[in-house]
Amino acid sequence: MKLNFAKRMSYIKASEIREILKVTEQEDVISFAGGLPAPELFPIDEINEINQIVLKEAGTKALQYTTTEGYAPLREWIANRMNGRLGTAFDKDNILITHGSQQGLDLSGKVFLDEGDVVLCESPTYLAAISAFKAYGCSFIEIPTDEEGMMMDVLEDVLSNTLHIKLIYAIPTFQNPTG
């Protein structure tokens, strides 16, 4: 039986991140390439305490399926925290819980990118973002960076002279992979 995959599957290549993470599974390897936090720094006691509080307060509701946007009390808490810290006016309907950056990047590509669109990105940039966006048939133009981020003169030139730019992907804090 021949499977008839979607055309966009031809854009998807093996993940560089997946290959890097395979190496990190070896016991004698300390990898600085995979973006993995040091396991000894995980706040196990704090997470256990929070789990106990959530289960005591929410019971089985905390373990049940919920809407695709995520657990409503958590979304409400995040909105209130953002409003208090940033002076914004979010409510829970402005918050979407993802299962990590990859799901967020994939959803962004799905919502914003069409085949043939151009994405501007920092050089270097997060490899997994390129993989996520590439699945939607876009191409990339790299913008060189300095200690302050994208070089604005190059960015302005590219914006003035390039068609079909749909998205600028930038990491404004703790840039990956440069830190």
Language-model features: where?
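N-terminal "arm"/small-domain region of PLP-dependent enzymes with the aminotransferase-like
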Residues: 2-66, 80
